[in-house]
């Protein structure tokens, strides 16, 4: 007896296989993949009711290493392997190192990570350690680490720099815009996302414009990039020497993709704005409690920025908005645990438990 299937399952092939004809990949290249991409676009029904907009969340924390970085890393490591390079190198506050280490392990090559002094989310660093990365802490901030990494890659051609200054990273990350259009059938009115090193806003804009040039969409979104107030060089129009924010993934004072990010903002008639740590944390708790989506603090910057832009009228009620939430909340559990309530035991008694829950 043959049992009919209860669901149709179409295995996702990874971003290179899914969009190979739109990516700079050689015919004889073998993708280094963990089946990244294909992440859900979730209708944020409660946020939509609260704001009067139609909001969708692009949940990039469901990529293999828990962040959007995997889209670009499959391209970067595939490219490095195809060109015979023996190691990949990155400067990282966490997510890039986790992704680079995983894909390097998959490819069988060395991964080296330069991390700054100061706050690093341990959940992210643990991933890089588990994948066998060689980690070196630098006496400086992220921007110092990236400058050093650039010099090393320039001086040693067997090493590939896989930060978002590597253009093939942007190529991989643009596929998220393709996926959004493929699901919605059009571009959103506004696309909101966090901005740190600014590669992602660059990549999304590239993806949307390529689909527009191909005639697959007839409009382009306005790009809304939110930075943490303590690390907001694009908002201020000048580098920040000592960036500081609870959102460690966007604690960057001089974005590597500054020029292309400004182009994306200007060409889309978009906007950069700053959200305080308090506003970011409020959005972090809000999206977890009303939508069931647990994100790391930096991811919540996109929602914090959107709420501010709705309040000041820049985003009109009734607009269709996509918010990219870039990383999983398990990347930075310490932030969530700061609000852990004190726990006191109750008797082994159902009535006592129901009363404790306030359900009596």
Curated annotation (Swiss-Prot):
EC number in record: 4.2.3.1
Entry cofactors: pyridoxal 5'-phosphate
Catalytic activities: O-phospho-L-homoserine + H2O = L-threonine + phosphate
pH dependence: Optimum pH is 9.5-10.5. Is inactive at pH values of 7 or less.
CDD domains assigned: Thr-synth_1 (cd01563)
Signal peptide: none
Alphabetic keyword roster: Acetylation, Amino-acid biosynthesis, Isopeptide bond, Lyase, Pyridoxal phosphate, Threonine biosynthesis, Ubl conjugation
Known role: Catalyzes the gamma-elimination of phosphate from L-phosphohomoserine and the beta-addition of water to produce L-threonine.
Protein known as: Threonine synthase
Organism: Mycobacterium tuberculosis (strain ATCC 25618 / H37Rv)
Gene: thrC
